[in-house]
Amino acid sequence: MTSYELQEFFGMKGGVEWLQTWEGMQWSFRIAAGLLMFCAHTVYGKVILMTDWSKEPKDSRPSKGTWFTWAAMDMTILVFMLMEGTATSMVAVDGTINVIIFLIALWVGTNSWTVVEKGCVCITLVGIALYVTLGNTAPGLLCACVATTSGVIPTWLKERSTPGGEDKTAWMLWMASCVCGVIGIPGLLEPSKWTVANVAQPLAFTIVCGSMTLLLFILNPLFPLSRDERASVEG
């Protein structure tokens, strides 16, 4: 639990009665989002650690560049949300474990780093520069979230052209975490109360996980690409 989640936990009144209110249920969903995020990363991390990568095709290994990009973007989002007091267990778990997976990727991963991923890091740096210049976290957070939604493109294309590289269980858990995170947005039913600090991260993560879930569970199984089509996607 982080930021307002801790405040709500220690400041709750009525215990079980409070948890039965809409605000209490939203708090529960935010906690569930963090737990599901942890489970998803655990599944993914276990695959990375337990696989004998010396026997696997090189292009199936985790990418150092990819995980550096995810770690940089998500830690930036976490820092900005901490500064605004809106960080949740979901983004805290995601940012922290992405750094750990990046460190593991340094050991077993490939050196690939796509143009899109480099662009995402640049967008994130622009966001940091805007914060330093303007003294406002909103532009920086928006840039980091835009970079996050764009950062899934290389992973999506790779899985579309070469199915089987992504773990379905992990992505299913990530998607469930995102759904809980969106339900837990403070003031969800009152759009006038939405802020960049509360809304941008859950929606950005949902776009990322939703696109991958659609690919893994619908597009690839029901509409597989031919060899020529895969080659065109890879190109």
Where are these regions (language model features)?
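Alpha-helical membrane-protein topology signature
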Residues: 2-235
